[in-house]
Amino acid sequence: MESIADHFFLAGLSNGFVSVSNSQFRADRLDEDAISVSSSIIQNNTRKSPLKRVSITSESSFYKENTFAHHNTTGSNSVGPKKPFLDYHHSTSNTPTKKKKDSFDHASVTSLHRRSLSSNTSTPRKYHSRKPYSEPSVIDKEHLQNRVSIGTTHTQNDLYQSYVAYPDALPLFAATHPFERRYPPSLLHQFPSSKDIKNETPTIDRCDFPNYVPMFAFPNDITIKESDVRPVSTYHSFALTSDNNSHLYGICVVVWVAMPQSMQNDLEKECEVWRANNTTVEDREVAEKLLSSLETERSKLSSLLLKMQEKELEGSDSIDPILLEKIDVCEENIILYTELLRPMRYKLPRFVHGLTNNRTLWIPNAYGLLSKHSHLQSFCRDWLRIVCSSIQAEDLDFIPSSDLNSLKSLNLQSFVKNICCDVPLPPKGLLQLQVNVGPLNLYAFRSPVNEIPGWNDVDLYPLFRALSIPNILVLFEAALMEAKVIFLSENLGMLGYASQALLHLLYPLTWQGLYIPVLPRRLISCFEAPCSYIIGTLSYFFHMDDVPLDNIPLVVCDLDKNSVSTFGKIVRLSRSLRSKLQAHLKLAAPLHDKFYVPHSPPKYTMETYPNNVLSLSTVTCFPLREKFSIPALLSFRSSNFSKRPYVLSPILNGFLKLQDNPSSIYFAKQTDSRQSSASKLLYARLQAPEHARNFSSPPFTRPASPSSSKFRFSSSSFQSTIRRNSLTSPYSVPELRSSESNQNKAGSINTGSAVNLVSSKPGEQKVHIMYKEGHKLRRIYKMFPADSAGSICAVSGYALGDVHVQCDNCGLRVNLDFIKHISMPCVPACFNSQQILVTFLKFFIKILGSYRNYLRKPHMSRENFGISKGSGGLIGSFDFNKFTRQASKVHGSWISSLCSSQAFAEFIGDRCELDLNDPRVALFDQLLLCERNHGKPRLFGKATPFLRDKSLEIQRIEVAPIPASLKNDNALH
């Protein structure tokens, strides 16, 4: 049995974090040699005998112009004798990537030569020389245990390079105040524990728990925050690579909790030590004098206020101006002394009345799940959101009282055991699992084998919202040519979204380089890996000096600033292919051009609970599933990209239980032929012409010169018809004022934000249109009490007011006070992810569509699939030269660079080894036929039975086992 989640973990500050920090500070000062070793990268280069690969070029890009300075170490479990670098492929190891945890055979500790940004010459890094010895020291053993595997890549001559990095030491300085220090995170809890895993039956398939998870949960270590309110909760996803090159995908939610009193006492003692060592007598005297003056002014103000209160009790109508003047002077002095003391905050005791009191110390805790399956991220993310909402339920808004009580009584341990042990992994297709998560239900499923893996789990919207289409094409070209790609952002959540989206756009190719969506600060040396990689890191600790320039091009993308910088020569697509891609992407994602969405990361990637409201994914909240429409879209022309395949409103407040009413959602026609009459009627209504639907969409005149404001309005003819059965959503917007009462001569209204009002025909009533996150919001007036009866605001759950707004495309209804809460996009009106995938899929079909014409032995096994010397350019059974020559005539010379990539080699290798009916091969082949047949079989066309096989689709819903705590509650009742 295999469960959805392999492990649950809780990471944060341990009770002895102050002593751990001090001991590490002393150890770092005593042993500088340990710091030099920690920044090196180990390369394991061995021949993989049973699985041969295709070698594309005689000079691999992984070896060209890369110089290594070897630091050799010998020992029983460390590394072997020093050998020439290119001789490691003579190893007799048959499974080099499946090593034991502490096996370092045929490895060498290497320090990479860093190349200057302004010069082409390489200068070696200065490291301490290390002499070989028979037994590893204590420091070496500690570093070997704390190594981090970051991935394995394939090179020429059937070599695999396994990269292992050592975390850098945490930089600490004696002059740093304890409140400003960064503390190393610790693993506070894991489930199942190591003991439980040993006692599990062999039938349970569970991966080992990595020992470096806390470092990825807190990539920039932990800081202590002092605030009156709870800091904003965040979340992010990350990927880990084990010693056998298998990937482990994690996602965690960071929740801030009040620091326990015992930890506060330890911290205050450390602050006293810091004040004694880092403050002078003069500083303390000045601080004490200012503090004494502040207390004097406060006591004086109290006495003056008491006198004023006595006069008011005596019934005196006149106000003494002298008394008022004295009160004003005291208040000004208090403000002055407080501001003077604020820079000297750390030189005072922690609790100072009026300056430091009533402020809580907050520490972060990371609650996370680990899974071997990358396409269950949406489910795990929403599961963690609901579970962690019980920790800060009092800080969230618009939770019904019944759900609030359920959250407060939620047994976290019981739900963790349920998701890790009881809830089975759903098969690909066939069924959905209904999983109980406190007061809500979530639905877990995996796409059938005849659909693109993860097409409905990978969220492409954040990448396309943050970057312009030309910048996205630069990233696509870099990934296609296997360059180095670095994502930068100030929030960790955006890094995971962008990295995963870029990999998803490469289908049917598979990324073969290193993949680290979130890189911890201590692993900054991973930038020196001499191979292709996709790495995401926080922008405020990234420096170009950390990235050596070599023969592999480098692309640095700042997701917060919509900027892409390239270093080195990246092979560009031909002008015709690039222009077609850009034109089709603009039709599929008009969010910036037609819906005025700014270029920046969306808010739901920055916060776990945007605007203190629990928002959930539509993928996990409904038992109905969006149809896989890519085969049908392949037959469409680009002009048909504006058609909507379905209408769906976002879930802005999961506690409104909209998932219990799936009939209020418009989905595309389900593939099951046994449809009910209601679903057929629903589909007929969806396919009806737009003017026949029950929602208003009057013509809209685009402003001639749109401003850069977030909200934009226009005026058009008012229609009182309101779309029914629409899904409401829970977010809010600034109050809009009536055009009749606020319209001025220039035709604009004052709403607190920039407004554009387009004049309408004389005699017609004006209606305001505003755009928020791709939603075209129209002001709706309730003409009769029966209008919108039973409808609620999608954010608050309150009844809709007499004046509210409604989205013309998805039917979202929100009261005016909650428009600013709209943080989820209007899909597919402003962004259609399936059409995005179709655009890139058509590109690959055009490039790779004729690949089978150059395969001479399609059923050849990989053991015999290799380089045939003297074969005139034949790579195994694939005629590489002929394919490149023919494709270059049509698409340009960049094809040769694509064919030299390892991703293309894997694509061809899979089709030479696997059977034609294997889903990994048949899916792309039949999508190719689908595009050639214009989406459906014709008289002389070929059928696509694999894509049309309804037996592979999701046909039923099963209820997963509920947590033990709920079973006990049901038994009591």
Curated annotation (Swiss-Prot):
Which InterPro entries does this one have? cDENN_dom, dDENN_dom, DENN_C, DENN_Domain_GEFs, Tripartite_DENN, uDENN_dom
**A single GO molecular function, which one?**
guanyl-nucleotide exchange factor activity
- For whether the record's keyword set contains Membrane, the answer is no
Provide the alphabetized UniProt keywords. Cytoplasm, Nucleus, Phosphoprotein
Subcellular location(s) per record: Cytoplasm; Nucleus
Stretches with biased composition (Polar residues): 69-79, 739-750
Has keyword Iron?
no
One Pfam family of this protein, by short name?
A: DENN
Residues annotated as domain uDENN: 169-427
Q: Name one GO cellular component term.
A: cytoplasmic vesicle
List-wise, which residues carry Phosphoserine?
134, 318, 726
The residues covered by the dDENN domain are 588-919
Where are the residues of the annotated region Disordered?
69-136, 693-713, 729-750
UniProt-listed GO biological process terms: regulation of Rab protein signal transduction; vesicle-mediated transport
Tell me where in this chain the cDENN domain is found.
449-586
Which protein, by its recorded name, is this?
Answer: DENN domain-containing protein C297.05
